[in-house]
């Protein structure tokens, strides 16, 4: 999965897809626990416009057009949407409300109340393992609305918190248990594109866990990767996805000797909730 990073304005969608992305990541900013804008703000990755934005409902409806056969904008390659939920300042109760409201808005504007809605898989990326109630609120809302089937298309990622330290894999696993999540688990690791690479120790530990007999992780992605050398290292370690500001760079590496025979772009037929090789 090549994940176009920080795609928050409608005009950025085709740009990222034309460069080779088959997945997109959006930043969802909340107002009174309601998803209101796709917006990141400053600071953000180097060489990027941090203040591009759109109303969330408009963006979700546009994503539906890009991922529903029959629309003029439909792009078969776009198979995964990662919603980076900016809920870091919420307590668990507020996060639950945010989960309820996110479910309602996606149901209405992206899934079109399950009537010819968007077909892409969805990952909810949550910034704090303490906010496990967000997932509960999201899942219970879709069930209450009579659309539990849509949960087959939804996965989850706890990305933090970053301070004072990132949670351990055991702590992350415990948060998923509290949220009632078994399977459909993505794990992210990485830093901004201007940060030093480091030794990828946490990434390697996560991949080892993913591949173990009792691992709880299904897929792992690394961000924000813009340099050829970093892409090569991430692929050699064994990531499932790469989040990038330059999808064409990833495409180039995938075509290199040593990689083109081992990796290919994911398609809609590849289940993002299945651990490769298991």
Curated annotation (Swiss-Prot):
Tissue-level expression: Expressed by the venom gland.
Chief site of localization: secreted
Record key words, sorted: Cytolysis, Dermonecrotic toxin, Disulfide bond, Hemolysis, Lipid degradation, Lipid metabolism, Lyase, Magnesium, Metal-binding, Secreted, Toxin
Cysteine pairings via disulfide bonds: 44-50
Catalytic activity: an N-(acyl)-sphingosylphosphocholine = an N-(acyl)-sphingosyl-1,3-cyclic phosphate + choline; an N-(acyl)-sphingosylphosphoethanolamine = an N-(acyl)-sphingosyl-1,3-cyclic phosphate + ethanolamine; a 1-acyl-sn-glycero-3-phosphocholine = a 1-acyl-sn-glycero-2,3-cyclic phosphate + choline; a 1-acyl-sn-glycero-3-phosphoethanolamine = a 1-acyl-sn-glycero-2,3-cyclic phosphate + ethanolamine
Binding site for Mg(2+): 25, 27, 84
Magnesium is among the record's keywords: yes
Enzyme Commission identifier(s): 4.6.1.-
Signal peptide segment: none
Enzyme class: lyase
Gene3D superfamilies in the record: Phosphatidylinositol (PI) phosphodiesterase
UniProt family annotation: Belongs to the arthropod phospholipase D family. Class I subfamily.
Chain's role: Dermonecrotic toxins cleave the phosphodiester linkage between the phosphate and headgroup of certain phospholipids (sphingolipid and lysolipid substrates), forming an alcohol (often choline) and a cyclic phosphate. This toxin acts on sphingomyelin (SM). It may also act on ceramide phosphoethanolamine (CPE), lysophosphatidylcholine (LPC) and lysophosphatidylethanolamine (LPE), but not on lysophosphatidylserine (LPS), and lysophosphatidylglycerol (LPG). It acts by transphosphatidylation, releasing exclusively cyclic phosphate products as second products.
Name of the protein this chain belongs to: Dermonecrotic toxin Ls4SicTox-alphaIII1ii
